A protein has these predicted regions:
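Short, solvent-exposed loop/turn and secondary-structure capping segments
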Residues: 8-10, 57, 121
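Conserved substrate/cofactor phosphate-moiety recognition/catalytic segment
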Residues: 8-22
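Conserved AMP-binding loop of ANL adenylate-forming enzymes
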Residues: 24-73
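Active-site glycine/GP-rich loop and adjacent strand/helix microenvironment
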Residues: 63-389
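Conserved ATP-dependent adenylate/AMP-binding module captured primarily in the ANL superfamily
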Residues: 20-35, 95-104
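Conserved adenylation A10 loop of the ANL superfamily
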Residues: 1-8
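A general alpha-helical scaffold signature found inside nucleotide-binding enzyme cores
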Residues: 18-21, 25, 265, 269
Length: 389
């Protein structure tokens, strides 16, 4: 999955009895939890990818395939129009959405947080409004997935300043719809077992069946499903929080960790420390990525945190100190190495829009948070943005 594109099979059975069924259940669960909702009196703005014909086959982002294949029933509740939703160029798509949807009764958003934030900023630029409630006063829901939402929450709350706004997490990957947040009082998701997916889990080299998982353990996810995948490792890791019913929380990617110096830093550690540092310094982080800085004859090793701020901290030094302190508190291996082979992290701040522009140029939808070498970090640092978004 490190290539520019990965090709996986998509069958009509998986589109209807996995992905579409998952979306319908999201609507049902949201309605059950919010009986006074009026979200269905308007439309859900869905920011999809693009697709095209390769021979007789339709190939593209799953979101675009879903929009293309389900238009006849979901078109009543979704914006923008199909031909706009699957425009390949992001700038052109945003401009078209602004023209088409500003006057629409939008009550919900759905999609990946980072791309939706970029669209929301474009809408505010287009309309000259201060926040999205001045554009769409009936907004009440954002169904999000694809990445950890916590780093984006503050930005969304500033753009949509309403206590009535609800955020619902879904685990809807290209390979299948796997879980959703069914209980607003909890921070985990219910694993959906009747969507045509057979789950197995890997712990080290051991393959564990669903009935053998343990709470508190992190597992890599393997699926055999109705889209033709057979014992396929999707690249995600999850932690079980309950086994009756089965509940999970997203723990990161199997390849996203840093262990160059024996520090065993994982995404969960990084997210926890970053949020704590933001709370202590008033910062809001848009995007970040971490890479190792290798040891030399004269210098110890370190981690370089490349950070794009939505709102900068009151002091970068205090932010760096807080980040380091929290990492040491949550990861004993990191703390031990900080006393020997590791210096405090190096903080590199980049201009707003750098990460999004890099993703667009590389055809990626997500920023790799932790990378065990410097390939991604050096690309991002060398990348020149054409504009600040």
């Amino acid at each position: 999955t490190s290539d520019r594109s990965k090709y996986i099979p998509v069958t009509m059975e998986s589109l209807w009895w996995n992905h579409t069924l998952g979306m319908r259940d999201v609507a049902t669960v949201f309605s059950a939890n919010n009986p006074k909702t009026r979200v269905f009196e308007g439309k859900t703005l869905t920011l999809g990818g693009s697709c095209s014909r390769e021979g007789r086959n339709l190939v593209g982002d799953l979101s675009a395939l879903l929009i293309h294949e389900t238009t006849f029933w979901s078109g009543w509740f979704r914006a923008p129009r199909t031909e706009t939703a699957i425009i390949p160029d992001f700038d052109e798509k945003c401009a078209a959405i602004c023209r088409q949807c500003v006057g629409e009764p939008i009550t919900a958003f759905a999609g990946v947080p980072s791309w939706n934030l970029a669209l929301m900023r474009r809408v505010l630029e287009y309309t000259g409004r201060k926040n999205l409630l001045e554009v769409w006063p009936r907004l009440e829901m954002f169904a999000h997935g694809g990445v950890e939402f916590a780093p984006y929450r503050t930005s969304f709350e500033e753009l949509i300043p309403s206590e009535k706004m609800k955020y619902m997490e879904t685990y809807n990957a290209s390979e299948g719809f796997f879980a959703m947040a069914d209980d607003p009082s909890r921070s985990d998701m219910l694993l959906m077992l009747d969507y045509g997916t057979f789950f197995e889990f890997r712990s080290g080299t051991q393959i564990v069946p669903l009935e053998g998982v343990e709470c508190g353990k992190v597992y890599a996810v393997l699926i055999t499903s109705n889209n033709g995948l057979w014992r396929y490792e999707i690249g995600d890791t999850v932690e079980f929080t309950s086994t009756n019913p089965y509940r999970i929380r997203f723990a990161g990617r199997t390849r996203q960790y840093i262990n160059v110096f024996g520090e065993e830093l994982i995404v969960d550690n990084a997210e926890h420390a970053l949020l704590a540092a933001c709370r202590k310094t008033g910062a809001v982080v848009s995007e970040y990525s971490v890479a190792p800085c290798y040891m030399s004859l004269r210098e110890r090793g370190a981690h370089e945190w490349i950070v794009e701020f939505e709102r900068e901290p009151d002091s970068l030094e205090r932010f760096a100190e807080a980040l380091d302190g929290e990492l040491r508190a949550v990861n004993s291996d990191y703390d031990a190495k900080r006393r020997t082979t590791l210096e405090r992290q190096r903080l590199t701040v980049v201009e707003r829009g750098r990460f999004l522009a890099w993703m667009r140029a590389r055809g990626k939808n997500k920023v790799p948070r932790l990378v065990n070498d410097r390939r991604v970090a050096d690309e991002i640092l060398a990348f020149q943005t054409e504009q600040t978004l």
